[in-house]
Amino acid sequence: VAEYQRKGTVWETVKSNAIKLAEIETIQPFIHSTVTAYSVLDMSSLIDFYIEMQDKFTNIKFMMHTASNPLGMSYTCLDERTRKIAASQISDAIKKIESRPKMGRIKEELRHMSQGISLIPIKDFDKLCNLTKYFDAMRDESFEDVFGYKLF
């Protein structure tokens, strides 16, 4: 998902760099993730990465926030069908970190997103679709190829 969301990103390089920084005992790495309409659809994988890093390194901290720009990138732009996918991903992610006190902030943000998905009215799905069409055309790739299902 990182590669789709931010063209040019090579996830293995990002992960390798995070590990190299965490291995330096005098550094306290802070992994700060921006959750978008795309990444929330694979939230469980991001949490798996957080857990993997926390299990290997005690000096690492995590933070996440949700994107609101560009217009159409917020998870609140998802339609009913994709909100169900996101809700399931968030629920799975919360279960994975339930017994991890160091991930309290992450759990709180996930719960906030879960509430938003169920309470915030659907709006701007067309903007997300248009942005996705633009990305797919510009990058010669497909949302469907990355996620395994159609967005619209």
PLM regions: where:
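Radical SAM enzyme [4Fe-4S]-AdoMet core and its adjacent flexible, acidic
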Residues: V1-F152
